[in-house]
Amino acid sequence: MDRRRFIKGSMAMAAVCGTSGIASLFSQAAFAADSDIADGQTQRFDFSILQSMAHDLAQTAWRGAPRPLPDTLATMTPQAYNSIQYDAEKSLWHNVENRQLDAQFFHMGMGFRRRVRMFSVDPATHLAREIHFRPELFKYNDAGVDTKQLEGQSDLGFAGFRVFKAPELARRDVVSFLGASYFRAVDDTYQYGLSARGLAIDTYTDSKEEFPDFTAFWFDTVKPGATTFTVYALLDSASITGAYKFTIHCEKSQVIMDVENHLYARKDIKQLGIAPMTSMFSCGTNERRMCDTIHPQIHDSDRLSMWRGNGEWICRPLNNPQKLQFNAYTDNNPKGFGLLQLDRDFSHYQDIMGWYNKRPSLWVEPRNKWGKGTIGLMEIPTTGETLDNIVCFWQPEKAVKAGDEFAFQYRLYWSAQPPVHCPLARVMATRTGMGGFPEGWAPGEHYPEKWARRFAVDFVGGDLKAAAPKGIEPVITLSSGEAKQIEILYIEPIDGYRIQFDWYPTSDSTDPVDMRMYLRCQGDAISETWLYQYFPPAPDKRQYVDDRVMS
């Protein structure tokens, strides 16, 4: 496993994979390959042609690393790169009457070394024409770019694209595809957060992780007044190729993406990740180790939520562990899963730079049968908010062999809340802290004699209030240790119930403790299932140190 670090901001999604063999296949498919932007040549395109292109590409050898950039682009700083602006007067759909959407392209440079080709498609005639790079499309401002080095570089390509929505047609984008196969979107706050990817390969194996690239995009010309657009993408990497169709709905309060892909394996793949997403969790109510700042919480997402094929709802709060952790949750035809950011209260973050209270959740809804597999969750130790350390994806049970073909359909919801909710009581928050003392005496006149860790899980909604007179029973399962001092407390401000218990070790082991809890009433489950992974300290650290100076 090669541990990855994802730098946020302009460096967040730098392409790290090799160059594609797309050029020869374009000519085979009779696409315009001429570098002359003024030749006006058009060629037929539709999704079936793209699938054939991806299939044929998989039969050829991957061509490795991208070619070098001109020096003036290769040596750019993030600040210089961010100062380059696309000329809004030359946007993709600038001439569409009553346009509600528009698209601009990202410049090559810095860590963005992979050439991405762009094509405009007339959806009525299915004719496509390539959009070639030229310096006149951009405003270089104070980036310090020597544009003389770019003259005649019509095949330089672009790094990616972003889409804007009225009334912010040139100021605030709502969708962005940039670097490798990364992409992201916003809700009505216009605040970016976590990212998705086209595909993940060998994220947690003994092989180096592979990052496929989107190497070309085809844009259907948007219709007048429309807030939905369609873009097609060709994916390429050493082990696999793919044809993707994104139908993207830029709604008032959310962005919804309908994704269809057709994948063609070049090689055997140890771990194939479908609908992968990448996020950041530094600290939160349950994990305080890295919260020695003025900010009470720092995270893009606070939990993994899963709606299993059997109907069970699971809430798994995220962690920032001291050692890399990978967990796989078995399922059969999952109904949905996602990394959610449900705490939207500014006072819980106190961050006027990151605005974590405004960051969207991302929910995956399979649209065809995915069969058996696992939802994988990787949590990487991180020292702060600039490194993405959370990865989640679906891994099919069937091993991937060279020559295999797959097709997946799913819908992505970028929104403040997921489109579906557990009808039972839901986990609102998880808190941890010192245990071993009666609640209300924290910790009293002296520290507890016996070390313990306290867990408090707040549940809201569902039939909790109706169940209370009949008796609410927490069902707690631990992989090691004991749960004691279990309490059920009504919390009036949230109109919910807190289940509180202390965990006591029964051995010196420092292996992660898997915890599972749900609520039931008269034998029936009345809540979603809470899953947690706790990392106990070494035996010599299981003590309370009174460092008070009394004289």
Swiss-Prot record:
Coiled coil: none
Places the protein is found: Periplasm
Keyword Signal: yes
Any single GO CC term annotated in Swiss-Prot or TrEMBL for this entry: outer membrane-bounded periplasmic space
GO annotation terms (biological process): beta-glucan biosynthetic process
Protein origin, superkingdom: Bacteria
Signal peptide positions on this chain: 1-32
Post-translational modification summary for this protein: Predicted to be exported by the Tat system. The position of the signal peptide cleavage has not been experimentally proven.
Pfam families: MdoG
Key words, A-Z: Periplasm, Signal
InterPro entries listed in its UniProt record: Gal_mutarotase_sf_dom, GH-type_carb-bd, Glucan_biosyn_MdoD, Glucan_biosyn_MdoG/MdoD, Glucan_biosyn_MdoG_C, Ig-like_fold, Ig_E-set, TAT_signal
GO function terms (MF aspect): carbohydrate binding; catalytic activity
Pathway(s) served: Glycan metabolism; osmoregulated periplasmic glucan (OPG) biosynthesis
Function: Probably involved in the control of the structural glucose backbone of osmoregulated periplasmic glucans (OPGs).
Family: Belongs to the OpgD/OpgG family.
HAMAP family per UniProt: MdoD_OpgD
PANTHER family cross-referenced by the UniProt entry: GLUCANS BIOSYNTHESIS PROTEIN, GLUCANS BIOSYNTHESIS PROTEIN D
Name of the protein in its database record: Glucans biosynthesis protein D
Species name: Escherichia coli O139:H28 (strain E24377A / ETEC)
Lineage of origin: Bacteria, Pseudomonadati, Pseudomonadota, Gammaproteobacteria, Enterobacterales
